[in-house]
From Swiss-Prot:
ATP binds at residues 10-20. Belongs to the QueC family. It is an enzyme of class 6 (ligase). It comes from Neisseria gonorrhoeae (strain NCCP11945). This is 7-cyano-7-deazaguanine synthase. Transmembrane segments: none annotated. Zn(2+) binds at residues 188, 196, 199, 202. Its EC number is 6.3.4.20. Binds 1 zinc ion per subunit. Its cofactor is Zn(2+). GO terms for biological process: queuosine biosynthetic process. It comes from the Bacteria. InterPro entries: QueC, Rossmann-like_a/b/a_fold.
């Protein structure tokens, strides 16, 4: 796919970094761009990690300001004083209403202006934390909507959609970057460098890594 370009929605976390590295290997570094969103997330370390990784991998990164979301929605991912909890309906209060819809919309607007058709997102429904906008049906719906809205042939790729977290770690291992993902990416909801090992995101990450490493030992 050396003649095609790709845009990766990039947060600096495990999943999006795995997708970014896979895109570089698939499309070629010169054909890959990253887009990152500042939406009022509670910790600056996420943005700092994303910037560092993009520079380290030699990928052009664009950061868009969507902090207006603070004016219209409230959740624990954007309020550092809020405790992280799961509601009665099973959806954690870290869920940001409309976030992935906005990310895909703005990514598509940017991509079309750059002549890019391939948009890559690291969302996953297998181990997803109860977020409705991480489901395959949502992404497929957005793909159709964006194509109709802009009269453009976008192809939204979600390479991790049906992988468990252990399988995502295994993919990183296959690409030769497991240690890089482990040491350089940031996933913690509490903004603790290296992870707090207590929040849902850290627990999912560590459990998946343990399963992956155990599987390697068994081979």
């Amino acid at each position: 796919m050396s003649n095609q370009k790709a845009l990766v929605i990039f947060s600096g976390g495990q999943d999006s970094t795995t997708c970014l590295i896979q895109a570089i290997q698939t499309y070629g570094r010169e054909n890959v761009q990253a887009i990152t969103f500042r939406y009022g997330q509670r910790h600056a370390v996420e943005l700092e990690r994303a910037e560092w990784i993009a520079q380290d991998l030699g990928v052009s990164q664009t950061v868009l300001d969507l902090s207006l979301m603070r004016q219209i929605t409230h959740n624990a991912l954007m309020d550092e004083t809020a405790a992280i909890e799961t509601a009665d309906n099973g959806v954690p209060n870290t869920f940001v209403d409309g976030r992935n819809a906005l990310f895909l919309l703005y990514a598509a607007i940017f991509a079309k202006g750059q002549g890019i058709r391939h948009i890559i997102a690291g969302v996953c429904e297998t181990d997803f934390s109860g977020y409705p906008d991480c489901r395959g049906v949502f992404v497929k719906s957005m793909n159709v909507t964006l194509n109709l809205a802009m009269d453009y042939d976008f192809q939204i790729h979600t390479p991790l959609m049906y992988l468990t977290k252990a399988q995502t770690w295994a993919l990183a291992d296959e690409m030769g970057v497991l240690d890089y993902i482990r040491e350089q990416t940031h996933t913690c909801y509490k903004g603790i460098v290296g992870g707090c090992r207590e929040c849902p995101s850290c627990i999912l990450r560590e459990r998946g890594l343990a399963e992956c490493l155990e599987s390697k030992k068994a081979v």
